[in-house]
């Protein structure tokens, strides 16, 4: 009977620990929690409670993680903290970045229709506004690659950029990464 009680205690302790660790997602998604406070709390959960920075909740069928949540909620300090805690950037984040390009194109031109760039979009990609946006996103991509993201996952973004005839910079960035990490 004593052994059964110990086993039950251990199982409930493990479940309780994982449930506590999932609170890190709540801190990121909570609009009332500042980025600074979210970063401090998450650091506590990782360093003091031993939570796994690469935790993926069972309800996240797509495999999204804390890094994806921090990025989508514009919590930059939390995002940087997670990278410094050796989180593994996943493929979901590359899809988010690729989608941001599509949304940006749509907000500033007619966008892409039927796998073709509109004439307005082809003119837009020559503007300073687009070049600034692309530079910001490419800095992020480089940062993610430097933290272990698989360059293969940028295939979707490459397809989007190829449609507008602007895939060469991404190709160079990915090739340079592959060369530097052989």
Model-found features: residue ranges?
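Ankyrin-repeat boundary/"N-cap" motif
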Residues: 19-32, 54-69, 88-107, 112-128, ...
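Ankyrin-repeat C-terminal turn/loop position
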Residues: 50-51, 86-88, 149
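Ankyrin repeat structural motif
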Residues: 35-47, 74-84, 104-111, 133-145, ...
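Alpha-helix capping and inter-helical loop/turn segments
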Residues: 73-74, 87-88, 165
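Leucine-rich solenoid repeat scaffolds
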Residues: 142-179
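Classical Sec-dependent N-terminal signal peptides that target proteins to the secretory pathway
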Residues: 1-18
């Amino acid at each position: 009977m004593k052994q059964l009680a110990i086993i039950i205690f251990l199982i409930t302790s493990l479940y309780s620990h994982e449930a506590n660790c999932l609170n890190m997602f709540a801190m990121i998604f909570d609009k009332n929690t500042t980025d600074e406070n979210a970063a401090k709390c998450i650091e506590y959960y990782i360093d003091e409670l031993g939570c796994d920075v690469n935790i993926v909740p069972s309800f996240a069928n797509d495999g999204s993680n804390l890094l994806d949540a921090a990025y989508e909620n514009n919590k930059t300090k939390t995002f940087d903290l997670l990278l410094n805690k050796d989180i593994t950037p996943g493929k979901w984040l590359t899809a988010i970045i690729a989608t941001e390009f599509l949304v940006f194109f749509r907000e500033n031109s007619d966008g892409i229709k039927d796998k073709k760039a509109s004439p307005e979009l082809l003119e837009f990609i020559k503007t300073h506004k687009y070049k600034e946006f692309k530079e910001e996103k490419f800095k992020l991509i480089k940062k993610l690659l430097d933290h272990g993201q698989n360059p293969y996952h940028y295939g979707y973004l490459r397809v989007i950029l190829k449609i507008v005839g602007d895939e060469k910079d991404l190709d160079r960035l990915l090739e340079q990464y592959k060369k530097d990490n052989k």
